[in-house]
């Protein structure tokens, strides 16, 4: 029976409405078979009813009813099969990041690749893809997606998911999404309109804003097999659908079969995570304890820093107060001492002022004399320098005069030679020009006759020239030689005349030069005068010259004599002044030498006496100072020991407070430590006993806490192995009243295992390896077990059981029955109470042990640090005694200092008087010379005359010595010098004229042959030409030589002339300077003799010495005076300052007393004085204490930053003007810490003791939690066992899946199976986890890392060749806790003669690969359903549907196999195939794409399987 139905659509779009023009539905022959649902364990599986496509390309409004098994889409290429499947997949997984339809009409286009093949399958406007499903609860759910193309070049598609529930089964999905607007017209509703329409019909419409929510709804309602929580889950599902759609073996699935087939073992992972979290929590508790310890350290730090902050300021104020009092007393002593010194300085000031006035008057006189001596010395030095220059210049001028005369003669000779050379050169030039002109004429002639004519003309020209120069009109060729000889003789006579005149001229020049020189010397000495009187003046000067020279030679002796007399006179004046000064200072009137010598002896004796007394006092003072230094060293030693001694005393006092004992000697401390060791051993034994008892109770509690009541965990394993139940588990609900009876009834067998068949178990007993010593087995039905198996009689105190015919067992009722849950819970409660009591006792004893240990530790620290000093004498008492002795020595030293000062003053005065006497006594004989002044005047007159002659000789001596040999030349004046000079000039001119005439006549003589030339041959012309050329060359060479000579003589003349000019210039400048120097030395007015400088210098030095001595004395006295005045000012200032300081210090002492009283009152009332008055700090400086306080303040600011009250109190305490605020802050800190003390745990009010007890308690808690951590630690062996069991379970499950694949055959493939193996690297990890290799256990015993990290490190250690990448150890460890990572899954097929092969597309045909791939996918879906069964509703069995496109790749047998597989597994299948598929089963749709006009649509004909039977 087959039903045929047909629906034809023609679609036309007009504006916003879609018009349905034609809808032709053929009548179905019979009513359709109702949609049936198969059952799965009594629960029907959900099914997909239909697929509806609205406004898709070719489908305006088409609903495809889906068969319960196989739905086939048949049609040619481009009929719309892939579009239909794409609509189904889009509604199932509406994720644009995953959708990719490769089989599309837009294949190869860039747009198609961008929209993943979806954009081209839609028409403009709103589109829908809707799935109509019915689940196991018979609920109809429509799920789908609204699609709409987005305008733009990217061809994007917008998707919105929704679901509809509550729609009647009779309602057609197409009618829901369209609205009829005419008889043959309809339009598509948008999403809002659809929502309103659904609500109007009473159904529920829901839109989803995320794909996760959409898939969550589909999973909960049984549409998809697995909950898709993430994009990764959606990707897996899509890959499965894609693999199903395109057929074949998907490498994406086969590579990750573990993720598809093996369920995630969340329970195991959660157990591991819980264990790790418990360990983490325990470690966090330990960290919290460490934090508490750090808080304790913070409190300890707070107490320490607060004590340092306040105690350092407290001691600094105490030191300052004591220092202020001492400073006030010291200021008062200095005040009185300054007043006494002021009185002494005033008397001394008067004496020194009188002496300064006398010294100032004497110094003014000496300064005038000294300045005069300095000026005189400067004049003498200037005169000597001028005289030296004059002498030097006179010598230079004499030398220059001689050189100048010589140079003039040289210049004149050079000039004459130059003129002669130039004349010769000019004559040679004339001859060369003549020869060159003749030669040129010869060369220009065309023939010999022309040359002759030219020579003749030149000869005639030369003859005319000679006539003109010589003035000879009758000159001819015949007489030319005679005239030439005449003129040549005349020229020689003129040359002799010139030479004679030059000789006379040189003699005249020498006489004139000597007369001029002598005349200049006379004028230089006597001044300008006529030349005629020069001889008389020279005679007078030379006559007086010898006597003046003799007188000048006596000048040094006279000057020395005058100097000696003046020096003696200066000594006489100095001696007079020294005597007056001595008498004035000594207040005496001594005049004679005897009186001065007697007084000198008296002063020497006085100095010796005073020196002896001073030496004695110095020795006594040195002894006292040495004693004081010894006392100071002893004081410093005790001062260094004092802080350590005080610290030791404080530590000893704390130990006495903690121990309640009094220690008088170091041996007492050692004895107490020994007793503490004995007490600690006793307490430790008690603590260990209580610990053992607590552990025993914990073990009992742990054993009774088992849920089934088994005391041995091995029994549970055996019960599971034998398939039985523990007897204790069967009687778990027995009442507490019946528990003693049943416990006695079963006796030792109360832990037996109840099994159904003892015979079956008996065979396994021989194979048992690990079991209790006594194992009881009872045969019976665990679901209906009673105690009838035993023959028993109840007595008063027990039960008698007939074990066998010859054996009875009597069991007394136990006092503490443990049979049944109620009895165990009661016993657990009792044990818990007892354990808590034992734990409390253990805690108390442990606390006492810790206390003893801490006390012993404190004593050990005291012994190591302070025992050597704690029992020594008090250093402060010794320091006080030393201070008293030092004060006595200081008083004696002051007395010695005052006496020594007076003696030193007397000694200085005596030494000063003795020094003056030593200077005065050697000069007494000078005072008796009375005629010294007359001798000085006489010597000075003689010296003046001698110095005048000496000056004249010095000024003109050189000139006179030059004048003396040439003075006779002044007798005759050479006046004919100018006449000779003119005559010589005229002779030279005549000589030049005659020489020119001789040259002209010589030229005519040379050309005489030319006059006879008339008809000579060519050879003669050439010979003459050659001669002319040779002559020209000779004359040119001669000219070059003469030119070079002229050039050399010109340069020589220029050089001689330059030297002459330099000498003349030097002579003029030095002569001028000489005259200037002579004038200057005359202006100075002093005599520049040899001894003048020495006398002036000696006089100056003597006056300077006297002035220096006077100035030194005056400077010393003025310094003393200034010192006294400054001391007086300083004393006045000191008096005012000391008075002011005394009053200021007194006011400070009075002002600080008020604040100090408040500090003392606060510290004493709060019992804090002992904590603040730390005597060891008294030895630190104020800066050190302030630095300690500042450092503590900085630490406290950080410590109390979170406590507002303490922070404010600290801020107030920072005011240095109110130290009492620091004490208040100290009290506040202690009060705050007292409030923080838990009085239920710590039995003290003292924060320091509380911190000590807190430390002990925290140590105990740390030990307990460390032990708990060891109990909580995960065993690596247990992890390995869990992993192995889980892997074994999953291997069994895979074997069950393989049973369903055994009979699947496609082509040559006869069977398919899954192969699961454990990876070698992970198998090594499991072996290592089992504990067989102890070297790896260090990782799991390390508390610093988690168990997961330990597993990761172990995996890296046993597999060092594997690169872990950038992943952390925790991530790797978590992966290793997932059993799936231990397994490798592969798919194998049994194919023909090849046997079992790995399932790969390359090894199989297309049909075989499709069938094998479909089998794998079915297995994955089935696995997903089983995996999700726990989290899905129990009344839900999900839909199961797969796809297959292009099914023509399968043969008919494979298609039948596929259909059979779907029927057996209750699965729906949607396949697409060409028209050659026979629709024998399921439902087949024939799709044909047609075009009517400009409209395109798909014609669909549905055919339900004709091979089906009713």
UniProtKB/Swiss-Prot annotation:
Recorded coiled-coil stretches: 346-706, 825-1154, 1248-1304
Subcellular location: Cytoplasm, Nucleoid
Assigned GO CC terms: cytoplasm; nucleoid
Region (Flexible hinge), start-end ranges: 707-824
Keywords: ATP-binding, Cell cycle, Cell division, Chromosome partition, Coiled coil, Cytoplasm, DNA condensation, DNA-binding, Nucleotide-binding
GO biological process, one term: chromosome segregation
A matching Pfam family: SbcC_Walker_B
Transmembrane helix is among the record's keywords: no
One GO molecular-function entry: DNA binding
Major localization class: cytoplasm
Entry binding sites for ATP: 75-82
UniProt KW Phosphoprotein keyword: no
Record note on domains: The hinge domain, which separates the large intramolecular coiled coil regions, allows the homodimerization, forming a V-shaped homodimer.
Family the entry assigns: Belongs to the SMC family. MukB subfamily.
Function summary: Plays a central role in chromosome condensation, segregation and cell cycle progression. Functions as a homodimer, which is essential for chromosome partition. Involved in negative DNA supercoiling in vivo, and by this means organize and compact chromosomes. May achieve or facilitate chromosome segregation by condensation DNA from both sides of a centrally located replisome during cell division.
Subunit comment: Homodimerization via its hinge domain. Binds to DNA via its C-terminal region. Interacts, and probably forms a ternary complex, with MukE and MukF via its C-terminal region. The complex formation is stimulated by calcium or magnesium. Interacts with tubulin-related protein FtsZ.
Listed name of the protein: Chromosome partition protein MukB
The organism's taxonomic lineage, starting at the top: Bacteria, Pseudomonadati, Pseudomonadota, Gammaproteobacteria, Pasteurellales
């Amino acid at each position: 029976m087959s039903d045929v139905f047909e629906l034809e659509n023609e679609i036309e779009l007009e504006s916003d409405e879609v018009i349905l023009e034609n809808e032709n539905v053929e009548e179905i022959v019979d009513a359709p078979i109702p949609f049936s649902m198969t059952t799965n364990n009594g629960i029907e599986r959900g099914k997909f009813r239909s697929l509806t496509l609205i406004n898709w390309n070719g489908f305006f409004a088409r609903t495809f009813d889906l068969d319960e098994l196989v739905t086939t889409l048949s049609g040619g290429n481009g009929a719309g099969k892939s579009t239909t499947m794409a609509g189904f997949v889009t509604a199932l997984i509406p994720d644009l990041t995953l959708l990719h339809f490769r089989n599309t009409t837009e294949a190869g286009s860039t747009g198609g690749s961008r929209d993943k093949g979806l954009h081209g399958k839609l028409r403009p406007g709103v589109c829908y893809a809707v799935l109509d499903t019915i689940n196991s609860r018979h609920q109809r759910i429509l799920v789908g997606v609204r699609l709409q193309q987005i305008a733009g070049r990217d061809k994007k598609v917008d998707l919105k998911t929704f679901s509809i529930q509550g729609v009647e089964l009779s309602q057609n999905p197409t009618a829901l999404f369209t609205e009829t607007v005419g008889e043959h017209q309809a339009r598509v509703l948008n999403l809002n309109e659809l929502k309103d329409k659904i609500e109007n019909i009473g159904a529920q419409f829901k839109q989803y804003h995320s794909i996760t929510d959409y898939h969550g709804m589909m999973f909960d309602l049984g549409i998809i097999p697995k909950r898709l929580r993430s994009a990764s889950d959606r990707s897996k599902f899509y890959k499965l659908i894609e693999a199903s759609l395109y057929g074949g073996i998907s490498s994406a699935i086969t590579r990750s079969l573990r993720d598809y087939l093996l369920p995630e073992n969340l329970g195991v992972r959660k157990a591991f995570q819980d264990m790790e979290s418990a360990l983490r929590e325990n470690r966090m508790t330990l960290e919290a304890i460490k934090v508490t310890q750090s808080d304790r350290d913070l409190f300890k730090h707070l107490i320490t820093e607060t004590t340092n902050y306040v105690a350092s300021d407290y001691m600094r104020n105490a030191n300052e107060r004591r220092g202020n009092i001492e400073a006030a007393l010291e200021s008062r002593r200095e005040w009185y001492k300054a007043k006494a010194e002021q009185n002494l300085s005033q008397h001394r000031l008067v004496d020194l002022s009188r002496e300064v006035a006398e010294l100032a008057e004497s110094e003014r006189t000496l300064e005038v004399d000294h300045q005069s001596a300095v000026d005189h010395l400067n004049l003498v030095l200037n005169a000597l320098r001028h005289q030296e220059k004059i002498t030097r210049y006179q010598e230079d001028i004499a030398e220059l005069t001689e050189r100048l005369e010589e140079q003039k003669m040289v210049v004149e000779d050079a000039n004459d030679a130059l003129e002669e050379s130039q004349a010769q050169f000019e004559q040679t030039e004339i001859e060369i020009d003549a020869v060159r002109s003749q030669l040129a004429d010869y060369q220009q002639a065309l023939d010999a006759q022309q040359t002759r004519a030219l020579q003749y003309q030149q000869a005639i020209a030369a003859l005319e020239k000679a006539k003109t120069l010589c003035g000879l009109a009758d000159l001819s060729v015949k007489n030319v030689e005679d005239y030439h000889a005449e003129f040549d003789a005349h020229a020689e006579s003129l040359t002799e005349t010139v030479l004679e005149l030059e000789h006379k001229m040189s003699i005249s020049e020498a006489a004139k030069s000597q007369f001029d020189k002598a005349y200049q010397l006379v004028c230089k000495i006597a001044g300008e005068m006529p030349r005629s009187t020069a001889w008389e003046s020279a005679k007078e000067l030379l006559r007086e010259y010898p006597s003046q020279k003799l007188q000048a030679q006596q000048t040094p002796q006279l000057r020395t004599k005058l100097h000696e007399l003046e020096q003696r006179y200066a000594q006489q004046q100095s001696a007079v002044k020294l005597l007056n000064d001595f008498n004035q200072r000594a207040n005496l009137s001594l005049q004679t030498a005897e009186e001065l010598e007697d007084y000198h002896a008296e002063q020497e004796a006085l100095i010796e006496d005073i020196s002896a007394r001073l030496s004695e006092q110095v020795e006594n003072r040195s002894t006292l100072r040495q004693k004081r230094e010894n006392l100071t060293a002893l004081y410093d030693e005790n001062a260094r020991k004092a802080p350590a001694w005080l610290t030791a005393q404080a530590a000893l006092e704390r130990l006495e407070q903690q121990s309640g004992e009094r220690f008088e000697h170091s041996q007492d401390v050692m004895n107490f430590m020994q007793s503490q060791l004995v007490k600690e051993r006793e307490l430790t034994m008690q603590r260990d006993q209580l610990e053992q008892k607590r552990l025993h109770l914990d073990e009992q509690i742990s054993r009774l806490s088992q849920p089934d009541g088994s005391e041995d965990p091995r029994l549970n394993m055996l019960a599971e192995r034998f398939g039985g139940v523990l007897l204790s588990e069967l009687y778990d609900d027995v009442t507490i009243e019946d528990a003693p009876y049943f416990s006695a009834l079963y006796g030792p067998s109360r832990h037996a295992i109840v099994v159904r068949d003892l015979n079956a178990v008996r065979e396994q007993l021989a194979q048992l390896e690990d079991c209790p010593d006594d194992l009881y087995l009872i045969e019976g039905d665990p679901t209906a077990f009673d105690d009838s198996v035993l023959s028993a009689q109840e007595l008063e105190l027990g039960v008698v059981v007939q074990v066998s015919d010859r054996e009875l067992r009597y069991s007394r009722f136990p006092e503490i029955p443990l049979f049944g849950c109620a009895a165990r819970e009661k016993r657990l409660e009792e044990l818990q109470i007892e354990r808590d009591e034992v734990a409390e006792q253990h805690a108390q004893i442990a606390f006492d042990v810790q206390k003893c240990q801490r006390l012993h530790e404190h004593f050990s620290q005291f012994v190591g640090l302070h025992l050597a000093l704690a029992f020594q004498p008090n250093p402060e008492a010794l320091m006080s005694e030393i201070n008293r002795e030092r004060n006595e020595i200081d008083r004696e030293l002051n007395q010695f200092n005052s006496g020594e000062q007076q003696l030193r003053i007397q000694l200085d005065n005596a030494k000063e008087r003795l020094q003056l006497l030593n200077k005065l006594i050697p000069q007494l004989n000078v005072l008796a010379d009375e005629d010294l002044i007359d001798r000085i005047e006489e010597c000075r007159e003689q010296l003046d005359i001698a110095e005048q002659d000496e000056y004249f000789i010095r000024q003109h001596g050189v000139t006179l010595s030059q004048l003396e040999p040439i003075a006779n030349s002044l007798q005759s004046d050479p006046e004919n010098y100018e006449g000779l000079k003119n005559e010589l000039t005229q002779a030279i001119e005549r000589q030049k004229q005659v020489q020119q005439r001789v040259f002209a006549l010589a030229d005519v003589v040379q050309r005489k042959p030319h006059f006879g030339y008339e008809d000579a041959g060519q050879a003669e012309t050439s010979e003459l030409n050659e001669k002319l050329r040779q002559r020209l060359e000779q004359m040119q060479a001669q000219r070059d030589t003469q030119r070079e000579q002229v050039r050399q003589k010109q340069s020589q003349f220029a050089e001689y002339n330059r030297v002459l000019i330099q000498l003349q210039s030097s002579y003029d400048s030095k002569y001028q300077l000489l005259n200037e120097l002579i004038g200057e030395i005359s202006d100075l007015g002093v005599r520049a003799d040899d001894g003048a400088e020495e006398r002036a210098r000696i006089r100056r030095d003597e006056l300077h010495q006297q002035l220096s001595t006077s100035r030194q004395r005056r400077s010393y006295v003025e310094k003393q005076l200034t010192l006294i005045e400054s001391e007086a000012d300083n004393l006045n200032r000191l008096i005012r300052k000391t008075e002011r300081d005394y009053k200021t210090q007194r006011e400070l002492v009075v002002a600080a007393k008020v604040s100090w009283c408040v500090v003392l009152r606060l510290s004493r009332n709060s019992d804090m004085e002992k904590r603040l008055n730390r005597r060891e700090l008294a030895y630190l400086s104020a800066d050190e204490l302030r630095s300690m306080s500042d450092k503590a303040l900085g630490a406290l600011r950080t410590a109390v930053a979170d406590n507002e009250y303490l922070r404010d109190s600290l801020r107030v305490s920072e005011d240095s003007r109110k130290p009492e605020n620091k004490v208040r802050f100290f009290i506040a800190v202690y009060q705050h810490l007292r409030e923080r003390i838990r009085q239920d745990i710590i039995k003290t009010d003292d924060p320091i003791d509380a911190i000590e007890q807190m430390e002990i308690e925290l140590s105990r808690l740390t030990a307990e939690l460390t032990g708990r951590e060891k109990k909580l630690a995960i065993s690596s062996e247990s992890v390995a066992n869990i992993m192995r069991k889980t892997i074994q379970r999953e291997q069994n499950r895979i074997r069950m899946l393989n049973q369903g694949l055994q009979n699947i055959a496609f082509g040559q493939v006869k069977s398919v199976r899954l192969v699961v193996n454990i990876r070698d690297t992970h198998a090594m990890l499991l072996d290592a986890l089992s504990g067989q290799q102890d070297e790896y256990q260090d990782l799991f015993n390390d508390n610093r890392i988690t168990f997961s990290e330990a597993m990761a490190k172990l995996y890296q250690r046993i597999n060092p060749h594997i690169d872990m990448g950038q992943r952390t150890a925790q991530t790797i460890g978590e992966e290793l806790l997932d059993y799936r990572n231990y397994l490798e899954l592969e798919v194998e097929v049994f194919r023909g003669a090849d046997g079992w092969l790995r399932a790969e597309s390359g090894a199989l045909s297309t049909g075989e690969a499709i069938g094998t791939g479909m089998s794998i996918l079915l297995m994955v879906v089935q696995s997903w359903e089983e995996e999700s069964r726990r989290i899905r509703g129990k009344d839900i069995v999900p839909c199961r549907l797969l796809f297959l496109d292009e099914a023509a790749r399968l043969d008919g047998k494979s298609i039948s196999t596929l259909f059979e597989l779907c029927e057996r597994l209750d699965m729906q299948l949607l396949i697409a195939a060409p028209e050659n598929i026979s629709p024998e089963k399921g439902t087949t749709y024939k799709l044909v794409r047609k075009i009517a006009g400009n409209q395109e649509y798909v014609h669909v004909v549905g055919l339900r399987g004709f091979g089906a039977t009713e």
